[in-house]
Amino acid sequence: MIYLVSNQKSLFETDAYKELSLSDAIDMIMPHSWIEYDSETAGLDPYTKPLLCTQYGLGEDQIVIDNVTIPIEKLRCVLEDPTKTFLGWNIAFDLRFLYHHRIVPYNVWDGMIAEKILYLGYPPQFHSLALKAAADFYLGIDIDKTVRGQIITQGLTIPVVQYAAGDVMYLTKIKEKQDAELEKKELTKAAEFEMKFTPVIAYMEYCGAKLDPIKWKQKMSRDKEEVNKAEAALNKWVEDYYEEHKSSTEGYIRVSTEEVPIMEEFKLFDSLNNNMSNVKRVQNPQTGLIHYEYDKAFPYVTRNLQGDLFSGFDTCAKCNVNWSSSQQVVPLFEMLGLNCTTIDPKTKVKKKSADIKLIKPQANKCTIVPLYVEYKKAKILVDTFGQKFIDKINPVSGRIHPDYFQLGADTGRLSATNPSLMNLPHDPFTRSCFIADSGYKWISCDYKGQESFLMASIANDVAMLDELVNGSGDLHSLTARIVFTDIPDDTPLSEVKAKYKPLRDAAKGYEFCFNYGGDWNTLMKNYGLTKRRAQEVYDNYMSGFSGLKRYQEFRREDVLDKGYILLNPITKHKAFIYDWDNLCKIDNELGSPEAKYMLGSNGDNYYKTSSQHLRRRLSDSMKQSINYPIQHAGSMCFKLSAIKFFNWLRKNDLLFTVRYCVPVHDEHNVEAPENIAEEVGKILVKCMESGGEPFCTRAHLGADISIEDYWVH
């Protein structure tokens, strides 16, 4: 039975539900410890849009309370009852509207988060997290969502009341099905842990962060200047290249082929094409080798021979490349000898690209590469971190309120959109644009070398642990001494940074590469090393960090044995290989006599394509099996410490006084009144250190703190 509590008499001109008083509604709700909960709002923002109604599912009965005429504060006795758990779907959204009325439930259960835990590792297109999809998947019920689009424009109407009640009819039944799957997959503890974090992430979204728009505009101007400088440097390089290589024909450059012996001249000649002009055969008088010189079109510069009234005459060749256009950049780069062919990560098909990840390792081929890298870095800052941040400042709160998702990656890490404050540039000026309110202090607290400590602890690598616990903690110097034979073994690590800085800087990249499953082949691709040198560096690294080597070997075997990545042994979070059954099927097929025959034949066929797909997918999964547990442990440290801090704020009646501004993977940023900032900072450090203990068991994971008027870290 559906009941409505409202002072709007027009809403009772139907027999679809019954009228109920607020006191009777509370009497019906109070005996229940698990309550299905949902809300309808006039928009997505609790600061500018009102709460229209809240719904309470009680098994066979659903109660809809009109919060336009019945203040939500009158439900505080229900919503803040610590004996009750509120079961919702994407309940963090509903919590933000409750927080706006300073109502903070103690216990929640989010069916959407439970569903994500069950299918962590699956791409979005493989399994929907929508309530409608879950009702169909688990119960075979089609929930009609057509009314939802009318709520913002029409408000609370009779159809909306019926629709609202429908959203709290099936949550318990879905949860029962989910619970069975969670138990089957040993994920119950993982779900229980994540549910404790859901109120915290809703609080982060509600609090937001304050941006100084004047200083941000200064940052935007600086970023634009850097783009202009980088673009000018690229243009000058192209113009200088043209002047150095230009032929007697305007718009052409003079190009030489490689030198070859006379016996191979016919091959060289055949490689020339009809588009080449003014071809000249040249023989080296000393070696006898042959090469050809010819004119080649160079459409990347133009020359203005007419001038105009305003700019006068400048007959110098000017670069006309749009450096933001891959279609224009790729032909130029290929002409300069750069490889612009890569594999599309989604389609797995070859494509042309001027992506910085592809171009940067080829710096040894052409001096334009470093200039292009600087341009792309500067352009990203302008395109990504510009006016849209100012546009996102809430007109009521005066703050930016991103959308966070607590399982935003297969590792369990948070992600953010609209906009993301988690991947802001680390330069001090950008960070300092985020400020504390007047009378408040900005508290930044981040883990000291979190990934290094977690890597060493989880891998149980003696060399790493010894340096982190008993030494200076400088793993970069230790890595440099291990992989580079130029550094004597008896060199104190304290001297490596000063005496061998270039090698230490290079070691940072190698360290990151190997720690997360890369090998010598990855080193060749990303850093442009020769095969021999890359293999030498890799072998030295794995010999020096034997514990890490054993850990990686175990992880590779374990994922192939289970079909999923065990992210941590405490809560048993798992990242599933979404197509594991299909990969096993392919593996079985490839063992057949027919497959073995076809794999040895010429040309492409089904079995060869399947074999390539299998190798690629298994390779990806093995690399992830090394990377994921480390990143996951970091996210668990962060979440557990945030839960502890949130609970302390609640216990000490400091919620909405101390604001949670920006969560970063290894860093907490909060705002506190000046008179309690020191105390809050000390508590935050304690929460972070205790939050790291269960996941970094072989070394102490400490935290650094700064208390300023703005974001420092």
Give the residues covered by each predicted segment.
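Function-dense linear segments that define catalytic or interfacial modules
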Residues: Q55-E60, V64, D403-S494
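Short acidic, Gly/Ser-rich segments with clustered Asp/Glu that frequently serve as metal-coordination loops
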Residues: W34-Y47, Y447-L454
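Active-site-proximal helix-loop-helix substrate-binding element of RNase H-like nuclease domains
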Residues: I2-Y17, D45, K49-E183, A191-I201, ...
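Short amphipathic alpha-helices in soluble, non-transmembrane regions
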Residues: V680-M688
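Short, contiguous acidic/charged loop-to-helix segments that flank catalytic cores in large enzymes
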Residues: K318, K388-P395, F434, S444, ...
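A short acidic-Thr-Gly-centered motif at the start of a beta-strand
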Residues: E19-S33, C77-E80, H426-K441, R650, ...
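Conserved "right-hand" nucleotidyltransferase catalytic core of DNA-directed polymerases
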Residues: M1-L20, S39-E40, T172-F429, G439-K441, ...
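Conserved catalytic core of nucleic-acid polymerases
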Residues: P199-A202, Y206, S397, H401-P402, ...
